[in-house]
Amino acid sequence: MSVKHIGDLKKTECYGCSACVYSCPFGAITMEQDREGFRYPVVDEEKCTGCGKCRKICPSIGPKDMSNAPEPESYAVWAEDNVRRDSSSGGFFTVLARSVFAQGGVVCGVVMDEDFKVFHTVATNEKEFVPMRGSKYVQSDLRDIFPKVKEFLGKGKKVLFTGTPCQVAGLKAYLGGEEENLLTVDLMCHGAPSEKVFERYVDETFGKENLKEFHFRTKRYGYNCTTCEAVFKNGKKYVGGIEFDPFVLGFTRSLFLRRTCESCKYASFPRQGDLTMGDFWGISLYKRDLNDGRGTSLVLANNAKGAAVLESVKDSVKRIEKTPLEAAVKKNRFGEKMQVHSQRRRFFEMLDYTSMHKAVKYCMEGRYDVGILGVWFGCNYGSIATYYGLSKILEKMGLSTLMIDKPGFVGQDRELDKSNHSRIFADTHFHVSRRYRLNEMHMLNHICDSFVIGSDQVWNHGIARNFGNSFLMDFVRDEKKKIAVSASFGHDRDFRPDRERIMASEYFKRF
C-alpha cells in the first residue's frame, strides 16, 4: 500500500482509529466526518512535512500483530445476577472494572451523553463507570483517549481499555510497545454504524429534546440482540424490535456500517486485545444450562496476561466454564469477510434527501419512488446527461429513482456493453434495474411507486417499437402515476399504423 501520507488512505482501508492524529509531531492531522457520518483523517498540507510517521503507525497500512494465540481459550461467564440485570450480556465488563478500580486503576470505555453522542472517556471510580455498561452500536468518537491512556500509564496507573479490535490495534500502535499496566479488551464486533445515522434516527423517531435515555439493548423483554428501548422525559417508553425499528433492522442487516467493516483483518484470529469480550450467542447449542436467559458473556484469553487476569477474577463471578472455541465461533463474527447489504451505497445517498426511516424501509424492501424509462442507455453523451439531470431533480424532491434497463432485447447489444461510456457512467451514478423481458415488465409494479418516461424520441415509432408498448407504460397498473417529461415523437406526425395509433391514444389517456 503506497500513500504519501494518511490523508491518501482509501475509505475502504481506514478504520478511523485516530492513532495517526496523536502520532503526528506537527499537529497536521484532524479527524472529520464525511458525508456518511464516519470520521476520517484530514491532513493540513501546510503543516505536513512528509515525515511518514502517520504511515508507520497506521493499523491499516502496517502488519497485523500476530503475537496473540491463534486459537485462544474460550470461556462462558456469568457475573452475579444483579450485575447481569444492568448489563447487555453476562456482566464480565463490570467484574473487570471493579478489579481495576480496586487496584487504583482507571477504565477507558464508551459512554453516551445527554445529547446522545457516543464517545470514549475515562472512569476513575464505579460511579463514573456505570454509563459505560451496555452495548453502543455506533462507532465511538475516540476524542483524546489515546493520549489520556498514555498519561495514566506514565503515572504508573493500571489502565483497562475496551474498544473494537481496530481501536485496540490503533491504541497499541500509538503506544508503540507492550505496557505492563495496560489491559486491553477487544469487543466482538458486528461492524460500526455512523454517528450521523444514529443522530438522524434519534431526531426522527423520538425528537432528541423529548428523550431521557436510550438503550441499544434491553433485557426487559427477554435476552436477545434485537430489542432497543427509549425512555422519554414524560416517563413513557418505546420498545423497538427488528420487525419495525429502522435502526435495529438496518444494523442487524449491515445496511449502514463503515466500509472497512466488510473486510476487517482485526475481526479474525489472533485477536488484538489481551482479552476478547462479548455475548456468547449460540451457547445453548453447546450447553443449554449456560443460558438462563439473563445473559452470558463470551471471554477469550488471547495471551498469558489475559489468562492471568481471568484467573484473578474467577472468585468474583457467579459461574465460569471453559468451552470449545468452536462453540464461540459458531454464532459470532470471527473472520475478516462480512457481507454488507447490497443497498448500502443507496442508503447513504437517500439519507441526503429523505428520512432515515424511509431510506431503511425502501432499501430493505428494494423499493423506489420512481422508475425512469427511456433511452438513457443510448451511447451518446446528451442522452445520459439529460437523464442524469432528471434523476437529480427527482432526488431534490425527496424521491428515490430506479433507472429501468433496456426492455425486452436479448442478445448482443453494444448499449449493454459494460465498457461503453454510458454504462460506466450509469454504474457510477444510477441505480439500475435488472433486465426485464417485455412480458416481465409488470413485475416493476412491485418495486416502483410511480413511473416517468424521460426525454428524447421515446415515442418515435421507429425507436419505440423495439420495446413493445413499454414506453407507453402498458405494463403499469392503473392506480400508479405515469408521467412524461420532455418526451418526443421526433417528427410533426406519428408514423404508427392506424390501429396502433388508436391503441397508443388509449395509453396516453392514462398519463
Model-derived features: positions:
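Long, compositionally biased charged/polar accessory segments in the mid-to-C-terminal portions
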Residues: 103-106, 208-367
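Gly/Ser/Thr-rich loops at beta-strand to alpha-helix junctions
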Residues: 89-91, 114, 161-171, 191, ...
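Flanking helices and flexible, charged tails adjoining ferredoxin-like Fe-S electron-transfer domains
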Residues: 1-4, 10, 46-155, 323-357
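Local cysteine-cluster metal-coordination motifs and their immediate loop/turn environment
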Residues: 12-26, 49-61, 164-170, 257-269
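Short, charged, surface-exposed secondary-structure boundary motifs
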Residues: 119, 191-201, 287-288, 494-495
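Aromatic- and Gly/Pro-rich donor/ligand-binding loops
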Residues: 368-504, 508
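Short, flexible loop segments at boundaries between secondary-structure elements
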Residues: 183-204, 478, 484, 488
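Iron-sulfur cluster-binding cysteine motifs and their immediate structural context
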Residues: 2-3, 13, 19-42, 52-70, ...
